[in-house]
Amino acid sequence: QLNYSPDW
């Protein structure tokens, strides 16, 4: 599973 979650 590849999930991109930015911290901005």
From Swiss-Prot:
Modified residues (Pyrrolidone carboxylic acid): Q1
Positions bearing Tryptophan amide: W8
Origin: domain of life: Eukaryota
Protein family according to the UniProt entry: Belongs to the AKH/HRTH/RPCH family.
BP GO annotations: flight behavior; neuropeptide signaling pathway
Name of the featured protein: Adipokinetic hormone
Compartments where found: Secreted
Keyword Secreted: yes
GO cellular component, one term: extracellular region
Lineage: Eukaryota, Metazoa, Ecdysozoa, Arthropoda, Hexapoda
A GO molecular-function descriptor: hormone activity
Annotated source species: Melolontha melolontha
Protein task: This hormone, released from cells in the corpora cardiaca, causes release of diglycerides from the fat body and stimulation of muscles to use these diglycerides as an energy source during energy-demanding processes.
Ranges in a coiled coil: none
InterPro entries: Adipokinetic_hormone_CS (IPR002047)
UniProt entry keywords in alphabetical sequence: Amidation, Flight, Hormone, Neuropeptide, Pyrrolidone carboxylic acid, Secreted
